[in-house]
Amino acid sequence: MEAARALRLLLVVCGCLALPPLAEPVCPERCDCQHPQHLLCTNRGLRVVPKTSSLPSPHDVLTYSLGGNFITNITAFDFHRLGQLRRLDLQYNQIRSLHPKTFEKLSRLEELYLGNNLLQALAPGTLAPLRKLRILYANGNEISRLSRGSFEGLESLVKLRLDGNALGALPDAVFAPLGNLLYLHLESNRIRFLGKNAFAQLGKLRFLNLSANELQPSLRHAATFAPLRSLSSLILSANNLQHLGPRIFQHLPRLGLLSLRGNQLTHLAPEAFWGLEALRELRLEGNRLSQLPTALLEPLHSLEALDLSGNELSALHPATFGHLGRLRELSLRNNALSALSGDIFAASPALYRLDLDGNGWTCDCRLRGLKRWMGDWHSQGRLLTVFVQCRHPPALRGKYLDYLDDQQLQNGSCADPSPSASLTADRRRQPLPTAAGEEMTPPAGLAEELPPQPQLQQQGRFLAGVAWDGAARELVGNRSALRLSRRGPGLQQPSPSVAAAAGPAPQSLDLHKKPQRGRPTRADPALAEPTPTASPGSAPSPAGDPWQRATKHRLGTEHQERAAQSDGGAGLPPLVSDPCDFNKFILCNLTVEAVGADSASVRWAVREHRSPRPLGGARFRLLFDRFGQQPKFHRFVYLPESSDSATLRELRGDTPYLVCVEGVLGGRVCPVAPRDHCAGLVTLPEAGSRGGVDYQLLTLALLTVNALLVLLALAAWASRWLRRKLRARRKGGAPVHVRHMYSTRRPLRSMGTGVSADFSGFQSHRPRTTVCALSEADLIEFPCDRFMDSAGGGAGGSLRREDRLLQRFAD
């Protein structure tokens, strides 16, 4: 036995010694190979490329990541076994050179990342084997020169990044092999000169970034960008450009984004943007532009966003934006603007974002048109965040243009010291004749609002052939201006008497020129001019005189105000100019009159009051929305003046709504929500439609069902409990002698004594009836039937049963 055991031990030791050595690890050291197709060696502190000879199947590797290490050199054999590689990442290393045969075996490589290394050049032919390469990152290196052979063989390249290098120039046709290139990044280099053929053969290029370079101060050669017929984005920001020549971008018909921000542009040729019909975004912020040629933006019919912030613009011609019908965003922030014409944005109805902050606005009569335009747009709920803050004059410094009236804007700063302007003003103040031959001097407060009127040479009468229909005062928000219009289309021929009194018309005036007509607005009926009555000694004037009407209205208003001040306001309604006071004291009794399935009518009352003349009558804004909707009151309606009711339509049936009303004075509303003038309503269900869900009835039905389920559960539990009780009773109905058999109330000794005494004299030859005649003192009573089962066994059976009883009940 001992010899057998020794033999077995010897065999085991020999077998262990004969085993082959353990195989080397499959994954290269410090790398992660959890997925057989991805070899991850990023941020592992490597100084050389790991050997891939230990990989069982290196041809299966598709992605190889070596970024974030300290690799300085790439040899010719580092990737020669990775023939199926698709993506190679070598970013953020210290690679200074690439062996010419580094990528010789990587014919299927599609993405190569060489960014943020120390490469100084791309040797010709190094990238030639990469026929299927689509993405090449060589950004953040020290590449200072490029040659045409640097990109030879890269016909499939789509994106090329060369930003963050030290390139000083682009040789002609350097990108010619890249016929399918779509994205080219050349920003943050030192490029000073762009050759005429620098971008040759790049007909498919869509994105070109040349920002943060050192381009020459002027771009004059349109041939530089001529090959880029498909270019959609061109970024030339942060260069030293000072001048743009005419039609420099005329060969870019598909250009949609042009960025020239952060340059030193001081002058733009009027035709600088000629040919850019598809341009949608133009960025000119951060330059030194002091003016814009009137025709500069005329070709940009598709322009949607224009940024002119951070320049030195001091004035803009009213027709500067006249051809930008699709303009949506405009920034004039941080310029030197002091005034703008009210019609400068009239041709841009789609404008929804406008920035006018950071300018030195002078709030005088030159801003009346802009104030009128802003009031119109604010009344439509548009451009609500656009504000013009006054900087001059000192009395209005810090105030907003929206909250100023025309009297505050007429502060004497509009007078032009030039002789022509003073002459024009004097002519406006010359006595004007009425139709009856009277002469009247216009008031000083209204003289500047009217254009110079046509007059006869050395005469003070109206021009023959022109009939004036009086002055109609426009009151839109807080604007008031006199409008002189001609009655009927064209020119009306006067009566013979008027023509004779007027004399012949001068031949130098063109009578066929159509007058300019503004947009009609609703006039305030409460402030309409009274009809002048003719004096007994003068001829009747059907058309009236504009200055006479304006003077009468103004004098009447001033007389009422002076009378109110003299008698303490007795007999005159209160003068209200603040929208909050109007809501608090004048507006009252908002009630709901009628409610339908899709409409509702509300009515309110307005106490008697007076409004300042420049502000005009009070308008109303009705806010309504579904109850509990967030955000609140995103729907509202502006109502005309003198309105006391409104009907809301297109409501939703069987829905609660909250309706509020507030006053609008001079285009302003109270910043405090109108909580005191709100009413709730519930629209009726739609007729003919199926009734909606009655949630009360549904809740009651669900409660009833739940109660029934609870009752059923209780009934099931009660029935089960009763069954158990009945079973227990049935088991409790067993014979008395069985219950006494399992009773432990009496001691076993007395029970055994009685049994042994009674059964000690048992004899088998005695009749069996005597066996059943036991004494009443016995603990257990055995019925006679219990002893009948052994009768068939004869005497032997009785003896065996007796023996068992004696053994069981023995003392």
Curated annotation (Swiss-Prot):
Q: SUPFAM superfamilies in the record, alphabetically?
A: L domain-like
LRR-type repeats, residues: 61-81, 84-105, 108-129, 132-153, 156-177, 180-201, 204-223, 230-251, 254-275, 278-299, 302-323, 326-347
Q: Please list the residue ranges that the record places on the Extracellular side of the membrane.
A: 26-696
Single GO MF descriptor: lipopolysaccharide binding
Region (Disordered) residue ranges read 484-549
> Where in or outside the cell?
Membrane
Explain the post-translational modification. Answer: N-glycolysaled.
Its induction note reads: By bacterial lipopolysaccharides (LPS).
As stated in the Swiss-Prot or TrEMBL entry, residues carrying the post-translational modification Phosphoserine are S798
One GO cellular component assignment for this chain's record is:
lipopolysaccharide receptor complex
Q: Which CDD domains match?
A: FN3
User: So which tissues is this one expressed in?
Assistant: Highly expressed in the brain, ovary, small intestine and spleen.
Q: Does the keyword Repeat apply?
A: yes
Q: Where is the signal peptide?
A: 1-25
Q: Where do the LRRNT domain residues begin and end?
A: 26-57
GO BP field: inflammatory response; innate immune response; regulation of cytokine production involved in immune response; toll-like receptor 4 signaling pathway
Q: What is this protein called?
A: TLR4 interactor with leucine rich repeats
